[in-house]
Amino acid sequence: VLVYNGSVCDAVWSASAGYNTQTGVYGTCASLDAWGTDVPYLQSVESPYEEQYHKLLRRVIGKDYTYIEYNDSRTGEPYQSADTTHKDLGGFVQYNTLVSNGRSYRYINQFVSSRYCFDFGTDAGGTPCMTYYGYGHGVGMSQCGAVGYAAEEGMNYKQILRHYYTGAQIRTRTTRSGGLFGWLAGLFR
């Protein structure tokens, strides 16, 4: 069981963090930016073994993408530019600004990863494209990073969990008398 200060951890994870888990703008805790909750064991850590998963290009065409339309709904004209410069220390986008005819639209991102960039007009038809780095919220353990740590550094599951969940401890259930209550009491020793 993974515990922090005697309490069982909410060991969240994502598929790929893209080189490091989310870096909090408001401090060192990644969970604060992702969900607005300060969880001390969910801090930003390196996750370097994600090279093959790091850059996932996904092209998004017009209204097929449910979270954003690339045309201004009031004028029907395409957005002229996108600004993703509002990022935290780890490169995760905090919010975006879309510009259409000089007007800006700021919205909270809801994409498959919060580390991405827009690239307008890169194909022959001028289809807007997005490049994602990582896949998921980027908080807690990265599955791709964990595989890399095991393969490249020979880390076992305990070392990997300690790396991704800062300050957490692994407690082993024992078969001593007292049943479940005895085991739970052991968590607080």
PLM features: residue spans?
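Conserved, single-site charged/polar hotspot
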Residues: 1-189
